[in-house]
Each structure stands twice: as C-alpha cells, then as structure tokens.
Amino acid sequence: MVNLSDNPQALDINQIINILPHRYPFLLVDRVLEIDVEKGYILAQKNVTINESFFQGHFPNAPIMPGVLILEALAQAGGILVHLRGPGDKIAILLNVNHAKFRQPVKPGDVLHLKGEGLHFSSKGGRIKAEALVNQKIAAEAEIGFVFVDKSQI
C-alpha cells in the first residue's frame, strides 16, 4: 500500500510502480505532481524524450507521440487516482475511452502534464475527465472509465 502521509500531494516513481502494474517500456507516468484523493484530482507528468522507441517509426523525420499512447498515459494517471479511491486489494484497469480529441502534437522534449478529475467513483470502478497538456495547452482530452479487478488477474 502507498503511504501518502509524508507528502500527500505527490508520488515518486517507486510509489507509482507500487500502484500500477505497468513497467518499462509501457510505464508512461514519471511523477505525480499533485493528488487529492478525496476531491478526485490528479496531476501527473510524463517527460517525452527522443529515446522513446515509438519515435523510430512515428515518424522518423517528424517524430510525434502516438495519440493512443497519450490516451494510455492519461489512463495510467487516472488509474492511480481511481485505485487510491477504491478497495486496496483491487486494481483499476481501463474499461473505456469516450469523446477522445487530439488538439496538438506531442514531440520529443515536451513535458506532458496528465490531469484527471473524477466524474464518478463507486465500488466497481470510476470515470474521469482527462486532459493532456503541453505548455498549458490541451494536446488531448477524453473521458476514461475504469473497472476494478483482483490483482491476481493482472
């Protein structure tokens, strides 16, 4: 279980990997800058570097982060929030994505801020409004749903 008592508004990578089942190269949250579990809010960060393997093919002469991976990063940040709102013996996994829109490209060197605000939480899962921002401008947005499953299923 994650101890939020030391700094209740931030999580480091060690705390993140204790919550999320993802690992390199698919762990897309580097830090949680702010989290308020009671209010249902999270602000996380992904540092986008040219070393990301997906830039080799997307696209070699004009690298941009694939939109589906931006959504995955948002889902991982949201999954942290939903998990911390839920029962400790379960994990929040992606259920659905609705109203996804991509507003601007995300490029190597960008700092991607992943913002999630709770729309609904229950004992079965949750739903968030999510925004990915670069330089305080929306790069992508969506509503993301989660369901709880036993950790043994992952």
Swiss-Prot record:
One of its GO terms (cellular component) is cytoplasm. InterPro entries: FabA_FabZ, FabZ, HotDog_dom_sf. Keywords: Cytoplasm, Lipid A biosynthesis, Lipid biosynthesis, Lipid metabolism, Lyase. It holds the Pfam family FabA. It is found in: Cytoplasm. The active site is at H58. GO terms for biological process: fatty acid biosynthetic process; lipid A biosynthetic process. The keyword Lipid biosynthesis applies. NCBIfam families: fabZ, PRK00006.1. HAMAP family: FabZ. Belongs to the thioester dehydratase family. FabZ subfamily. Involved in unsaturated fatty acids biosynthesis. Catalyzes the dehydration of short chain beta-hydroxyacyl-ACPs and long chain saturated and unsaturated beta-hydroxyacyl-ACPs. This is 3-hydroxyacyl-[acyl-carrier-protein] dehydratase FabZ. The gene is fabZ.
